[in-house]
Amino acid sequence: MDTINRRIRVRFAPSPTGPLHIGGVRTALYNYLFARQHGGDMILRIEDTDSNRFVPGAEAYIIEALEWLGIKFDEGVGYGGRFGPYRQSERRDIYRTYVRQLLDSGRAYIAFDTPEELEARRAEVPNFQYDATTRGQMRNSLTLPAEEVERLVAEGTQYVVRFLVEPNVDVEVNDLIRGRVVIDSSILDDKVLYKSADDLPTYHLANIVDDHLMEVSHVIRGEEWLPSAPLHVLLYRAFGWEDTMPRFAHLALLLKPEGNGKLSKRDGDRLGFPVFPLEWKDPQTGDISKGYRESGYLPEAVVNFLALLGWNPGNDQDVMSMDELIRLFDIEKCSKAGAKFDYEKGRWFNHQYIQRKDNAELAELFRPILRENGVVATDEKTAHVISLVKERVNFIGELWEQAGFFFIAPLSYDEKTVKKRWKEDTAKQLGELAELLDSHRSFAAEATEPTVKNWIETNGYHLGNIMNATRLALVGESKGPHIFDIMEVLGREETVGRIRRAIEILG
């Protein structure tokens, strides 16, 4: 199996059975990093062979989510390419050809056993599986006369095509993460490859045929597919494609924060974090699940966070851009063990990226929140405000919590703060401060601060009392950045107006 001189081609092949789970996002990301690092191609293939589980809107959701995260494709659904179509439901004729090839070569057979008959066998025989020891007792083209098989097919009797697994064959799987694994084919069952009921192949056949025809060089997927890898190797052999079989890499699971089991939506609901990249509305129940985007995460933070769940660059660096991840990523250094999902670390990453992001870009993201609150502000003012408060926030949505008072004057004052900060002589002193500020020429922080502090010292007032009471008047509580920075943003008229309004209300 020589892949040294092959062009690197990987695929992300989700099924449109619901929203893309964050574990699936990580799989897409690792494929993307690997492809870009090697100058290869990234393919988007939609594996929609299971019509019973198809969910309207899921395919569009998957594409939008990956675009938001900056995971780009070179070909596939929505991108085109010379190996299309890339939606499996549109490749029926192709699959039929290869089903027939397996039947003609004796590597597969037709089985007519009904679901009820199979269920009865399972009830009779503990751990029953359809394999070399049982296929001779079942209703299939190996046990029925050829003319009866032809008659049943011609009459429209529903059937499946099963792969004929030869027993006592060593099947070797070379995994880039887990190393060399050899299993005895005798433990494998004769998997269904095709169902006449819907004229579609199962995952196993479609997957192998598509990867071969699309010249996929590496299959990077979740470890839930590891038990199927020996079957896939046997299918490559059956078709005579072993020399061009892709290299496999099976990624360890994302685990619950406690480490006991696979991460699920229920864990997110229980602990208060998203498990989907974007908000998802279930078309059947109408239930809405929050996404990372709607929760205020930056896409680059999500990418960085996910990249380090199951892989690390071998140094102390945590914060890495997509370009840095592409340069450093090594599929063979991915962990064999599952990675605990540390949602607090995700918050930390988002905080780091908010600090690094340009204030003008953050202002663009903050604008919809301002609109929701009835605020119209200049880009310049919004960016200035963000520069003052962003070190206190982990998410875009928290900007309003920290900065809303810059845009809307407080309608009330925190009772505890009033009791603690509003003294008997506060109204008189703030009245004098309002007069001073109203006559001050420049309202830049570096101009007002020395003037106010000099006035406080000259009058023998207490600096802390004046500053705390002024903050209460301007903000409504004891929070916010440097008080003179607040004054500068608010401007003379608004600052003086808020101080005088507080005096009027609090007395």
UniProtKB/Swiss-Prot annotation:
Classification via PANTHER family: GLUTAMATE--TRNA LIGASE, GLUTAMATE--TRNA LIGASE, MITOCHONDRIAL-RELATED
* Lineage, highest ranks first: Bacteria, Pseudomonadati, Bacteroidota, Bacteroidia, Bacteroidales
Which gene is transcribed and translated to give this protein? gltX
Q: Which SUPFAM superfamilies match?
A: An anticodon-binding domain of class I aminoacyl-tRNA synthetases (SSF48163), Nucleotidylyl transferase (SSF52374)
User: What residues does ATP bind to?
Assistant: K265
Q: Where in the cell is it found?
A: Cytoplasm
Record-given protein name: Glutamate--tRNA ligase
Record GO terms (molecular function): ATP binding; glutamate-tRNA ligase activity; tRNA binding; zinc ion binding
Q: Which Pfam families match?
A: Anticodon_2, tRNA-synt_1c
Task: Give the reaction(s) catalysed.
Answer: tRNA(Glu) + L-glutamate + ATP = L-glutamyl-tRNA(Glu) + AMP + diphosphate
Does Plastid count among this protein's keywords? no
